Amino acid sequence: MATVSMRDMLKAGVHFGHQTRYWNPKMKPFIFGARNKVHIINLEKTVPMFNDALAELSKIASRKGKILFVGTKRAASEAVKDAANNCDQFFVNHRWLGGMLTNWKTVRQSIKRLKDLETQSQDGTFDKLTKKEALMRTRELDKLENSLGGIKDMGGLPDALFVIDADHEHIAIKEANNLGIPVFAVVDTNSDPDGVDYIIPGNDDAIRAVSLYLSAVATAVREGRSQDLAVQAEEGLVEAE
């Protein structure tokens, strides 16, 4: 089963929080102390909390659950996309559009438009347009791909959110809360843990730390999905590959 050790976390700098003056007092239970005016996160709390989160995400994946990775900060953007693709899940890695979950009906129409434009760009429709019209549609396609490309095949609301930086993604968390979708999130010392069902106290800026979370989650999800396939194979529903 996918797990992460304290040594892995120390090497990745998971324990380095934000400057003490930016702290959120609600994170006090997860703070070990301060060094050079920077809060140090208590990894004795983080390790079991993260491993619990991984086990639960694996369970959700084993039930064919859809997991939406959310990380729109520039530094995390590419890693979020790669991790989601790596385990055949979904992602939002540029900008969270308000209503992305709570107004799914409208989002679905935009996804339909995105798919129509993709078809047009491949079937020669764009070639028949004036240069200006083709350019306008290409721009629209790029814009839609940027914001919705990671969820265009989700086919409905996700069963869980995995969030890098609870502070930065507070709108996504609020929408998931409103819909009763469980939230798994990396919560740094400057963030509010309210609304997060599975709190992972840790550094949300260092790329090594972010990569550690993402690759562990992707592995846990893949393991969960392979359990699902193994069960189906036993029941004779699919032929084991």
Curated annotation (Swiss-Prot):
Keyword Lipid biosynthesis: no
InterPro entries on file: Ribosomal_uS2 (IPR001865), Ribosomal_uS2_bac/mit/plastid (IPR005706), Ribosomal_uS2_CS (IPR018130), Ribosomal_uS2_flav_dom_sf (IPR023591)
Keywords from the named record: Ribonucleoprotein, Ribosomal protein
Gene Ontology terms, MF aspect: structural constituent of ribosome
Any matching Pfam family: Ribosomal_S2
One annotated GO biological process: translation
Superkingdom as given in the UniProt entry: Bacteria
GO CC terms of this entry: cytosolic small ribosomal subunit
Keyword field contains Transferase: no
Listed Gene3D superfamilies: Glucose-6-phosphate isomerase like protein, domain 1, Helix hairpin bin
Family: Belongs to the universal ribosomal protein uS2 family.
PANTHER family: 30S RIBOSOMAL PROTEIN S2 PROKARYOTIC AND ORGANELLAR, SMALL RIBOSOMAL SUBUNIT PROTEIN US2M
Name of the protein in question: Small ribosomal subunit protein uS2
Lineage: Bacteria, Pseudomonadati, Pseudomonadota, Gammaproteobacteria, Enterobacterales
Gene: rpsB
